[in-house]
Structures are given as C-alpha cells and as structure tokens.
Curated annotation (Swiss-Prot):
Pfam families: DUF3474 (PF11960), FA_desaturase (PF00487). A motif (Histidine box-3) lies at residues 300-304. The histidine box domains may contain the active site and/or be involved in metal ion binding. It comes from Vigna radiata var. radiata. This is Omega-3 fatty acid desaturase, endoplasmic reticulum. GO terms for cellular component: endoplasmic reticulum membrane. One of its GO terms (molecular function) is oxidoreductase activity, acting on paired donors, with oxidation of a pair of donors resulting in the reduction of molecular oxygen to two molecules of water. It is an enzyme of class 1 (oxidoreductase).
Length: 380
C-alpha cells in the first residue's frame, strides 16, 4: 500500500480556523459572468492585422537566426543559436495555438491556414492538437476528463511499469514528453493525435485530422530530404536541437501552469467540478523577458476561462479581473530577465506530485515517498 502524504494546509498556508484561512477548493462567491463583466469590451476585439504582424515578426526572427547560423556555422555561434531559435519555435507554436482557439482572427479559414503553416513547421499536427487542446480547456481541472498533464489516479500510478514511472517523475525526462504525448497520449489514456479514428476525435473531425497529419508528413519529408542534401549533422544543429529546446519550453510552461504552485491546488470530479472552478486551479507565471517573446502565455488563468481573448489583451484583462477573483487569483512571483526561479517549482512538483486518490470529488496530489528510494535501489 502506497503511503501518501496528507494535505496539511490550504492555498495560503493557513490551517482551518486561522484568521487568514483560505480553501482554494471551496466554491467561489462569484460567477464567470462577473469576471466577464469586469473585463473591458475592447479586450475581446481581435485585430487580424495585429495578429499577422506577430507572425511576420516571429518568422523574420526565425529566418534571420537560421541565415546567421548557416553563414557563421562556427562552434561559438551554435550554442547561442540553439536556445534563441528553440524559443522562437515556441513563439510560433503559441501563435498557432491562438489560431486553434479562434483568438487570432474572426476568420476560421485564416485561422486554419495560418495555424497549419505555423504548427506544421515545428512538427505539430494542427487539427489533432487543436481538438485535444479544446478538450483540455473544456474540462480543465477534471481528474478523468482533462487532457493535458492529467494527474494519475493511485490505481493507474501503481500499475505503471518501472521505466514509465521513472521517466515521468525524474527530471529532465518530463520536459521532453510532448512528442510521445502526440503519438500515444498520457498513461491511462489511449489514442494518437495523428490517427483520425482515435477516440480523441468525433467522426466529423476526421477529415481535418487527416489534413493536419498530411501537412506534418510533408514537412517531415522536406526535413529528411534536407538532411540527405546538406548532411544530417548540420540539420541536427540547424533544426533538431532548436526543436528539442521548443519541446522543453512547451512542457515546462504547460506543466507549471497546472502544477507546482507553492501550496497544493485541488482537482475535481463529479458534481464538484465546474468550468469556473476547474479554470481557477490554473496558475499564472512570470517569464521575465520571455513574456513578450512567447506572447504573454503566462497570463494563463484568464486565458483558460476565456480562450477567445487575443493574447495581446490578456495582461489588461487579467488586471481588470483581479478585483473579482480575489484570493482565487494567485499573483505570480516576479521573474528576473530569465525565469530560472521556476526551475525550483518544477523540480519540487515532479518529486512530490505523483498521484491523486481513486475516490473523492475534491482531491489533491499525494506523494509516494518510496518512489525514488525504489528507483535508487533497483539501479544499484
């Protein structure tokens, strides 16, 4: 029997009965309509020209970086190029993500066209991921129905093979999980983002999934051709390493938007779950200089509740909503130029947030104290 840590305190560190006590799992005293009303009307307005200007900016930076790498092709430039280009790949992903939400423009055709280009270039199947991400937003904070970084139940956790358990809960493996998730989803779930007959998709969505998989295949074929033409080592340096940096950013950011807060946050089942309560379990993060580069994706609470708000209005919308959210909004810790401070929360969460109870409509992450002891013993 796994011995789990019992939740000792709530969202602000106070115990029940203390004057400062706050239970983050309690139903909020406001409705989602109250939050919506607090957000200025212009924050809902989408500007196609403004959105396209961000695409142009990012594509120009990606092109300039690649051209510089090809031109210099020297040992001192590559270590500078890799994190810069990988971060820009991540920025392209966020713009494609906005297309998937429809916050890029009011034209569904333009959203689909731009989204397919941006995501295919970084080997993401646009429609396959867009649909599963929609499921994530519609069911955020739900133990069984959520899609992204879903907590494992104790039963599923105990049934993991040793290798899967080690990879999931040992740094740095979790921040390289995204390509595997695209192919096979998370433990306890079945399906692939590339398979139109996966249970991720309805029959009416299959054609779009086929289109995205074909686009993904075309880009992969071009990359393989270039590898044969200019050499696999050069392509690894030009595209492969930045792709891995992009994957690290994606997993790092998405994980910490739903995990790793200073105090444990609830997950829900059954009648305790609601769209509002699930959305309030998300966490805003400050990424310093990277905030502007990756289009303010750190303003995650309001984005999760209202994904149709364009990214360039999220900061203002968040400020306006704070008066309604009260203690249900957790102010992010300020970052230096680069968000190195977040590594601490990532490592703490990976080492402590292992599973949730098989039963109960409001549950919190629990820790398996034997996990790393067993891994160490078996490795000796």
């Amino acid at each position: 029997m796994i011995q789990a840590q019992t939740l000792q305190h709530f969202g602000n560190g106070a115990r029940e009965g203390d004057q400062s006590y706050f239970d983050p799992g309690a139903p909020p005293p406001f409705k989602i309509a109250d939050i919506r009303a607090a957000i200025p009307k212009h924050c809902w307005e989408k500007s196609t020209l403004r959105s396209l200007s961000y695409v142009l900016r990012d594509v120009l930076v990606v092109t300039a970086l690649a051209a510089s790498a090809i031109s210099f092709n020297s040992w001192f430039f590559w270590p500078l190029y890799w994190p810069a280009q990988g971060t820009m790949f991540w920025a392209l992903f966020v713009l494609g993500h906005d297309c998937g939400h429809g916050s890029f423009s009011n034209s569904s055709k333009l959203n689909s066209f731009v989204g397919h280009i941006l995501h295919s270039l970084i080997l993401v199947p646009y429609n396959g991921w867009r649909i599963s991400h929609r499921t994530h937003h519609q069911n955020h904070g739900h133990v069984e129905k959520d899609e992204s970084w879903v907590p494992l139940t104790e039963k599923v956790y105990k049934n993991l093979d040793d290798m899967t358990r080690m990879l999931r809960y040992s740094f740095p493996f979790p921040i390289f999980a995204y390509p595997f998730y695209l192919w096979n989803r998370s433990p306890g779930k079945e399906g692939s983002h590339f398979n139109p007959y996966s249970n991720l998709f309805s029959p009416g969505e299959r054609k779009g999934v086929v289109t995205s998989t074909l686009c993904w295949g075309i880009v992969l074929s071009v990359l393989l051709y270039l590898s044969l033409t200019i050499g696999p080592i050069f392509m690894l340096k030009l595209y492969g390493v930045p792709y891995l940096i992009f994957v690290m950013w994606l997993d790092f950011v998405t994980y910490l938007h739903h995990h790793g807060y200073t105090h444990k946050l609830p997950w829900y089942r059954g009648q305790e779950w609601s769209y509002l309560r699930g959305g309030l379990t998300t966490v805003d993060r400050d990424y310093g200089w990277i905030n502007n580069v990756h289009h303010d994706i750190g303003t995650h609470v309001i984005h999760h509740l209202f994904p149709q708000i364009p990214h360039y209005h999220l900061v203002e919308a968040t400020k306006s909503a704070k008066s309604v959210l009260g203690k249900y909004y957790r102010e992010p810790q300020k970052s230096g130029p680069l968000p190195f401070h977040l590594l601490k929360y990532l490592l703490q969460s990976i080492s402590q947030d292992h599973f949730v109870s098989d039963t109960g409509d409001i549950v919190y992450y629990q820790t398996d104290p034997k996990l790393h002891q067993d891994s160490w013993t078996k490795s000796k």
